[in-house]
C-alpha cells in the first residue's frame, strides 16, 4: 500500500517560490488501478515522479507498506526503485542501438540478474505484449505502438509491484492507444500490479478502478 500524507513540493525559479504540490493526502491499496487527471501544469507528472522515487518531496510523507523510503541512502533507494517500480512514459526512451529483446532485458542486467534469467523473462514478456516475432528488431524498425509495447515489457522485466505510466498513449493514434490500455489493464487484473496512470483520456480513466483529479497542485476530485 502507498500512503501519501500532506505531500508538498516546491521549486525555486528565478528567485520565485513555486508550489507545485500543496498538501496531498491519498491512500492507494495494493492492486488498485488509479487514473490521475488534470490539465497541464496541475502537478500530475511531479506527483508521479515522487511516487516513483525519481524526485523527493519538499515535505510530507510517502510510505510504501509503512516505510518512508525517502529517508534511505540514495543507493538503497535506487535498488528499491529498480526492484519495486516500473515506468512507462509518453516517449518510449528505448536505446536505439539495441533490439527489442536487449532493451527489455536492460533493467534486469543492470540489477545483476544472470543473463540467462533476464533473457527468459524478456522473451516471455515480449510474447505477452504480442511482439514475439519482433524481438530482434531495433526501435527504428518498429511502429510507435510496437515501441511502446517494448517499453511496457521493459517496465515489467523486474516483476514490479507498482507500474507508473505517464501519458503512455499520448503519442499514439486512438486504435493503437487502446491496445496499450488493454495491455496495462490486463496486467493489473491478472498479476495484481498496482497501476497508476497519468492521462488526459477520460475514456481510459473510466476503465480504471479509481481516479483523482489535480488542479493547482491539489486533489479536487476523488472517485
Curated annotation (Swiss-Prot):
The alphabetized list of GO BP terms reads: lipoprotein localization to outer membrane; protein localization to outer membrane
Answer yes or no on keyword GTP-binding.
Answer: no
Keywords, A to Z, come to: ATP-binding, Cell inner membrane, Cell membrane, Membrane, Nucleotide-binding, Translocase, Transport
What the entry lists under Gene3D superfamilies is as follows:
P-loop containing nucleotide triphosphate hydrolases
**Protein name (Swiss-Prot/TrEMBL):** Lipoprotein-releasing system ATP-binding protein LolD
Q: Which family does it belong to?
A: Belongs to the ABC transporter superfamily. Lipoprotein translocase (TC 3.A.1.125) family.
Q: Which residues form the signal peptide?
A: none
The record's section on PANTHER family has:
IMPORT ATP-BINDING PROTEIN, LIPOPROTEIN-RELEASING SYSTEM ATP-BINDING PROTEIN LOLD
EC main group: translocase
Q: Which SUPFAM superfamilies match?
A: P-loop containing nucleoside triphosphate hydrolases
